[in-house]
Amino acid sequence: MWIPFLHIRNTKEAALKIKSDEEITMGKIKVTQCGDIEGLKVVEPTVFGDSRGYFMETYNYNDFKEAGIDVQFVQDNQSSSRKGVLRGLHFQINYPQDKLVRVVSGEVFDVAVDLREGSETFGKWYGVILSAENKKQFFIPKGFAHGFVVLSENAEFTYKCSDFYHPNDEGGLIWNDPDIGVEWPVPEGMELILSEKDQKWGSFRDFRR
């Protein structure tokens, strides 16, 4: 059975489109399309540094809109996790969310999986290192599952959402699903730490039924 949010179509946006792996600078940000997965983007802000430290805009609606990310965010979240914590792969079923995620302390490997019905990249995943050092952000449109694993001793993770959290609307996929095949960069000997809920999510194969 198809989950309702899968009817979010992978349509062409009227806003500026960015070709696969092409970079474009708009205002104070650089946006890179993630391979051939339409709508999935890595955002890099301009950092102004001097002897005192640095300053950067982490979000500016006008700059993002010019770069093709015209989203109204309504909720900001922040989590703290220790090394080896893996959260995901999560989505909301009837209230799907656009997300803009970044790391303010530490380092994570962040993953998005395309679950949009009709998408040419349905079931394909993309991962990116987000860290306090590289200051990259990951824009994940509606219709994706999302998760991350912490690679540093600790990590502070923040994200903006285009819809509110609905606890009764949670969906998920098991993190190590063989059909999706996410290549988590987990060093040998590092223990993974998952919540009981994240250990029990279903498979991609069941999700498609």
Model-assigned labels for residue ranges:
Residues 18-133, 152-154, 161-209:
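Non-catalytic, conserved peripheral segments adjacent to functional cores
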